[in-house]
Design a protein with these regions (language model features):
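Non-catalytic tandem-repeat scaffold regions and their flanking low-complexity/translocation tails
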Residues: 1-174
Length: 174
C-alpha cells in the first residue's frame, strides 16, 4: 500500500548506492527495515559487488541483518559455499545469523545433498542451528521427511520448536 510507494519510487529513480544511503538514514522501525531489505535485494541483483561492499560496511550496525540476508541469498543461489565463507567472516550476531540462514536456504534450493554434507561437518553451535533452520525451511518443499529430521536435530530447544512448527506448517500446505 502507501508504505511501499516511497520505497519503490526511491529504488526506481536512484542508483543502488543512493537508495542504500537513503534507506540507512531512515528512522529505525518498520519502514526502515522494509527499505533496507528491499534495497539490498534490488542492489544484489543489479550490482552484486557493490551490494556486498555495502553489506560489509553496515555489518556491525543495528539492522544489518536486513542487508546481509538478501545479499547472501542472492550469492547462495550461484555459489553457496563462497557465500557461507563470507558470512562466517562477518561479526557475530544477528546479521551473521541472517546470512547463515539465507545461505543454507539458498543452498538447499540449489544442491540439497552438498548442503547437508556441509551441515553434517559443521561443529555444534548456534550458527549450525541457524543454518539447519534455513536449510529445513527450504528442504520441506522437496523432501518433508528429511526436513523434519534435520529440524529435529537443532540443539536449541526454542529454535528447534520454531523450526519444527514452520516445517510442519509448510508440509501441511504442500
Amino acid at each position: 500500500g502507501m508504505m511501499h510507494a516511497p520505497i519503490s519510487a526511491m529504488i526506481r529513480i536512484s542508483s543502488p548506492i543512493e537508495a542504500a544511503q537513503w534507506a540507512s538514514q531512515l528512522d529505525e522501525g518498520f519502514v526502515r527495515d522494509q527499505a533496507m531489505s528491499r534495497t539490498a535485494d534490488h542492489f544484489a541483483r543489479k550490482d552484486f559487488e557493490a551490494a556486498k561492499e555495502w553489506a560489509e560496511s553496515v555489518s556491525s550496525n543495528d539492522g544489518a541483518e536486513r542487508v546481509i540476508g538478501p545479499v547472501t541469498k542472492n550469492w547462495a543461489s550461484r555459489d553457496p559455499e563462497a557465500a557461507m565463507d563470507w558470512v562466517s567472516s562477518l561479526p557475530e550476531g544477528k546479521a551473521q545469523h541472517s546470512g547463515t540462514w539465507a545461505a543454507l536456504n539458498g543452498w538447499a534450493g540449489k544442491d540439497p545433498a552438498a548442503a547437508s554434507d556441509y551441515l553434517a561437518n559443521m561443529p555444534d553451535s548456534e550458527m549450525r542451528n541457524v543454518a539447519i533452520s534455513g536449510f529445513s525451511d527450504r528442504l520441506v518443499w522437496e523432501n518433508p521427511q528429511a526436513a523434519m529430521t534435520w529440524a529435529n536435530s537443532i540443539t536449541s530447544d526454542e529454535m528447534r520448536n520454531d523450526a519444527l512448527t514452520r516445517v510442519g506448517r509448510s508440509w501441511a500446505r504442500k
